[in-house]
C-alpha cells in the first residue's frame, strides 16, 4: 500500500510541483492549505491550490489555524520588534505551524508523512536525519528549517530538494497548472507590503513616537 502524504499547498508553484512529483512516484497524496490570517489573499490561495488538486485528481482540504498562528508567530513578531529585536517569523511558522500543527493533524488523520515545497533535502545519516542544502543554492531554504526536530524531519518529504526553481516551474507548466507562472512571494506573508511599523501600529491600535538618532562621537 502506498504511503499517505499530506502536502501543504500555499497555492503557489513550488508546493504544486511538490505534489505533482509525489503523485508521479506513486504516493497517495492529499493537498491541504493552511488558513493563517484573515486577508483578501487567503481565499485566492485556497482557490489556486484546489484547482491544482482538481487538475491532479487528488483530494483537497483547508485548515484554519488563525488563532495558533497569531499566538505562535504574529504576537512574538510584534513583541520582538517592541523589544528592539529583529525576528524571523518564517522560522517560527515552520517550527510551530507547518511542521508542528500540520504534522500533528496529518498523523492524527492517518497520514504517514507531510510534504512541502521548500528547497532543501533531508538525508539519513546513521540513526539520525540531517537537513542539507538544496540543489538550487539560490533558493536554498535550510536556514528557515533549522529548528526542525528529529521527529519532524523523519515525517517530512521535501520533493524539490533536487530541482531548480526553473525545473519546478517547467513541471507545473507542462501539466497546465493555473499557477505555473505565479510570482514568488518575497515578503513576510502577513505584511506583504513590507511596512512592519504600520502593521504593528494597526494591530496594537497605537501610534509610536519617533526615536532619536544618537552619534557616539
Predicted segments — roles?
Residues 1-146, 157, 166-167, 173:
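ATP-dependent adenylation/nucleotidyltransferase module used to activate substrates
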Amino acid at each position: 500500500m502506498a504511503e499517505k502524504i499530506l502536502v501543504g499547498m500555499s497555492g503557489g508553484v513550488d508546493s504544486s510541483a511538490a505534489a505533482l512529483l509525489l503523485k508521479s512516484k506513486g504516493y497517495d497524496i492529499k493537498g491541504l492549505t493552511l488558513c493563517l490570517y484573515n486577508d483578501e489573499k487567503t481565499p485566492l490561495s485556497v482557490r489556486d491550490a484546489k484547482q491544482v488538486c482538481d487538475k491532479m485528481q487528488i483530494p483537497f482540504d483547508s485548515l484554519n489555524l488563525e488563532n495558533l498562528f497569531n499566538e505562535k508567530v504574529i504576537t512574538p513578531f510584534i513583541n520582538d520588534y517592541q523589544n528592539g529585536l529583529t525576528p524571523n517569523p518564517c522560522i517560527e511558522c515552520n517550527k510551530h505551524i507547518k511542521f508542528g500543527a500540520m504534522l500533528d493533524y496529518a498523523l492524527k488523520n492517518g497520514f504517514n508523512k507531510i510534504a512541502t515545497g521548500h528547497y532543501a533535502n533531508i538525508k539519513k545519516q546513521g540513526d539520525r536525519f540531517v537537513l542539507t542544502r538544496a540543489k538550487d543554492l539560490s533558493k536554498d531554504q535550510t536556514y528557515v528549517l533549522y529548528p526542525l526536530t528529529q521527529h519532524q524531519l523523519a515525517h517530512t518529504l521535501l520533493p524539490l530538494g533536487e530541482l531548480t526553481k526553473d525545473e519546478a516551474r517547467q513541471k507545473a507548466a507542462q501539466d497546465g497548472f493555473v499557477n505555473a507562472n505565479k510570482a514568488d512571494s518575497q515578503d513576510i506573508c502577513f505584511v506583504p507590503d513590507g511596512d512592519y511599523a504600520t502593521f504593528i501600529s494597526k494591530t496594537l491600535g497605537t501610534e509610536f513616537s519617533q526615536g532619536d538618532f544618537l552619534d557616539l562621537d
